[in-house]
């Protein structure tokens, strides 16, 4: 009897592991939609993990449309880059569909600084120019993967990992990215650490970065 019970438990554990491996990707990403359409109702006051659905009678083709990716973003800023996002905020029809898009423009030597998307994997395609791109794995390895990519090349940034793009070429650069969430979110590392509101105390940051507090104060003053 004990042997039968042990065999049953082992089989149950194996089935559970198999189910988790088959369904882990679903659990870890945007939930699947349960109807054809769930266009975001921006006027709704309902608070859900996502956006409430608009009445199907009020849905129109414009809810699935965006115009503007043919236009270059304004790169006259300190980083020399601009992101034109196309997510559920711009296209309500993306609600529950688990995907979004963005155009990124880079001035000469422009940088999309180290950042993460907490809810999405990103795949990038270069349309013009050359980019030096990379991402860093999680602790404790913190391994850096980098590559120079050119027009027509594709690079993937795994979900949640810190990554960046730098205009490595001699002209302006343009890229299109797709992300595996209707609302991928962006955490720019420098802004989060040195520009939080309220500020993280300089005592904590000085110890974390092993520098004098005056150095931290100088950096925080820029954010």
From Swiss-Prot:
The keyword Glycoprotein applies. It comes from the Eukaryota. One of its GO terms (cellular component) is apoplast. InterPro entries: Cupin_1, Germin, Germin_Mn-BS, RmlC-like_jellyroll, RmlC_Cupin_sf. Glycans are attached at residue 74. CDD domains: cupin_OxOx. GO terms for molecular function: manganese ion binding. Oligomer (believed to be a pentamer but probably hexamer). Belongs to the germin family. May play a role in plant defense. Probably has no oxalate oxidase activity even if the active site is conserved. This is Putative germin-like protein 2-3. It comes from Oryza sativa subsp. japonica. The lineage of its organism: Eukaryota, Viridiplantae, Streptophyta, Embryophyta, Tracheophyta.
């Amino acid at each position: 009897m004990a042997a039968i019970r042990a065999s049953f438990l082992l089989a149950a554990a194996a089935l559970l592991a198999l189910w988790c491996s088959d369904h882990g990707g679903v659990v870890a990403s945007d939930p699947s939609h349960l109807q054809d359409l769930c266009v975001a109702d921006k006027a709704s006051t309902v608070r859900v993990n996502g956006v409430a659905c608009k009445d199907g009678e009020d849905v129109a083709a414009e809810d699935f449309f965006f115009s503007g990716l043919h236009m270059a973003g304004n790169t006259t800023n300190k980083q020399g880059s601009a992101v034109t996002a196309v997510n559920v905020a711009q296209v309500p029809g993306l609600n529950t569909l688990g995907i979004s898009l963005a155009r990124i423009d880079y001035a000469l030597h422009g940088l999309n600084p180290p950042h993460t998307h907490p809810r999405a994997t990103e795949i990038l395609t270069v349309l013009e120019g050359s980019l030096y791109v990379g991402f860093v794995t999680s602790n404790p390895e913190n391994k850096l993967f980098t590559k120079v990519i050119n027009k027509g090349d594709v690079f993937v940034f795994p979900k949640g990992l810190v990554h960046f793009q730098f205009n490595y070429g001699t002209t302006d650069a343009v890229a299109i990215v797709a992300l595996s969430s209707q609302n991928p979110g962006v955490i720019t590392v420098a802004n989060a650490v040195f520009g939080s509101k309220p500020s993280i105390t300089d005592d904590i940051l000085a110890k974390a970065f092993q520098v004098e507090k005056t150095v931290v104060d100088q950096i925080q003053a820029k954010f």
